[in-house]
Amino acid sequence: MDSQRNLLVIALLFVSFMIWQTWEQDKAPKPQVQQTTQTTTTAAGSAASQGVPASGQGKLITVKTDVLSLTINTRGGDIEQALLLAYPKELGSSEPFQLLETTPNFVYQAQSGLTGRNGPDNPNNNKGRPLYNTERDTYVLADGQDELVIPMTFTDEAGNAFTKTFALKRGQYAVYVGYDVKNAGTQPLEISSFGQLKQTIDLPSHRDTGSSNFALHTFRGAAYSTPDEKYEKYKFDTIADDENLNVNAKGGWVAMLQQYFATAWVPASNVTSNFYTADLGHGVAAIGYKSEPVQVQPGQTAKLASTLWVGPEIQDKMAQVAPHLDLTVDYGWLWFISQPLFKLLKWIHSFLGNWGFSIIAITFIVRGVMYPLTKAQYTSMAKMRLLQPKIQAMRERLGDDKQRMSQEMMALYKAEKVNPLGGCFPLLIQMPIFLALYYMLMGSVELRHAPFALWIHDLSAQDPYYILPILMGATMFFIQKMSPTTVTDPMQQKIMTFMPVIFTVFFLWFPSGLVLYYIVSNLVTILQQQLIYRGLEKRGLHSREKKKKA
């Protein structure tokens, strides 16, 4: 296999990967968008087995820290809206990114409460969700204040007192949700806590920020973690098909994911909880947990607690909230390579202070580490090229005798100490690293709206002037012209001729950070080719004159 065939293999693998990604994203039929009023009225019946009721109408209170702005409904205490104040909706916009939303066309809420036999959120105990009382309608984290606490109180008809407390800290996206239950009666109370995330499956146009069909589609859907299964995705269409999750675990978490952002309920690690998914009807899916019952004796008080993550997928901060929560960053099936690569990229950024220059630096590092494989690949291909005259003579001599041809070719390879797969094996090792870098650059929120230099103001967006994709195509064309070839098939020659153009078209819609990586990688390839060819010339395995005549 010569270097141009090698390039063709990479191209075919790449295109096949893109087609597979697009098919995975688009193969499921999409449900119709429904009205929020329909979804809320059906939630109670659909999740009846969990004892989780629907939301109702109550007063909306606002909670604001330096990084979060939450809207909480006093009817049940659900979070119906979450704005991420440090992340603009679009580059240059003063409007913050909205993660949780409750509108006629789309619902994405973080619900929580107390259910079980005597829980106030059990639809059998009340006419609806408990209506909590608060001291104020607005809570704002003041300057010099590090924590904001929002107590909400409710007393049922039997006189039992329930306090639901939200606690938010400065600079944090983890929200503490605690419950104090005081039994004022003469009989024990049986209480379970729950946390549920529900979302409309089909995205309205204003929230559909997915990549183009030529680029990677990051995962959007549910996920969970237990001590036995540290990270499992759960597709929305799986929930819609009623193939629902139903596992018990001590510790773990449940989440809903999208590119760059996530919400997750983390129950107390010392309590066994049931993790579930549910189709709430009308195109709304839910994932949640329900804790094991707690007995509250007469005159006694019990405490229950959980944590809600609502924010960007910042790996080190998520790892502090719960084990394996950092795995929600969608690095695909090569996460075990992408994660250390991102840690290296972040370490480089701590010195350079620019994500674009950090991408350039990590490209040099990765290609430097892979240089021995690249050298072995080029050496093997050079040896194979030198054997081509002997192989051609062998074909002419043996004709259609394939068995003898195979035997003599293997004997020739053995005599010349050439591995026919030597050009492929290094490529097979490099491809996972190549794809892991691809996932890493596409899935890291740190690159969202991150500027580089000159006209590149957002490394997560496409080049507005298409300069980088054209430069990438030019470097690919130059590599192709530099590379020796023994390709004689006219069809392969045509494919190779148009491959830089095809790749340039593909990369027009790719994030500029990813295109930058490919440009630098191609430039490194050009440098490494020159070094390797000079060494091969000294060994008599390569001739520049032959390349010029070819």
Curated annotation (Swiss-Prot):
Coiled coil stretches, renumbered: none
Pfam families membership: 60KD_IMP (PF02096), YidC_periplas (PF14849)
Membrane-spanning parts: 6-26, 346-366, 421-441, 459-479, 500-520
Swiss-Prot/TrEMBL GO biological process terms: protein insertion into membrane; protein transport
Main location: membrane
InterPro entries assigned to the protein according to its UniProt record, in alphabetical order: Membr_insert_YidC, Membr_insert_YidC_N, YidC/ALB3/OXA1/COX18, YidC/Oxa/ALB_C, YidC_ALB_C, YidC_periplasmic_sf
Membrane disposition: Multi-pass membrane protein
Region described as Disordered: 28-54, 111-132
Gene Ontology terms: cellular component: plasma membrane
Keywords, sorted A to Z: Cell inner membrane, Cell membrane, Chaperone, Membrane, Protein transport, Transmembrane, Transmembrane helix, Transport
Low complexity composition bias: residue spans: 30-52
Keyword Cell membrane belongs to the record: yes
Comp. bias regions, Polar residues: 111-127
Compartment annotation: Cell inner membrane
GO molecular-function term, one example from the UniProt record: membrane insertase activity
Role according to the record: Required for the insertion and/or proper folding and/or complex formation of integral membrane proteins into the membrane. Involved in integration of membrane proteins that insert both dependently and independently of the Sec translocase complex, as well as at least some lipoproteins. Aids folding of multispanning membrane proteins.
Assembly and binders: Interacts with the Sec translocase complex via SecD. Specifically interacts with transmembrane segments of nascent integral membrane proteins during membrane integration.
Family in the record: Belongs to the OXA1/ALB3/YidC family. Type 1 subfamily.
Name this polypeptide is given: Membrane protein insertase YidC
Organism: Cronobacter sakazakii (strain ATCC BAA-894) (Enterobacter sakazakii)
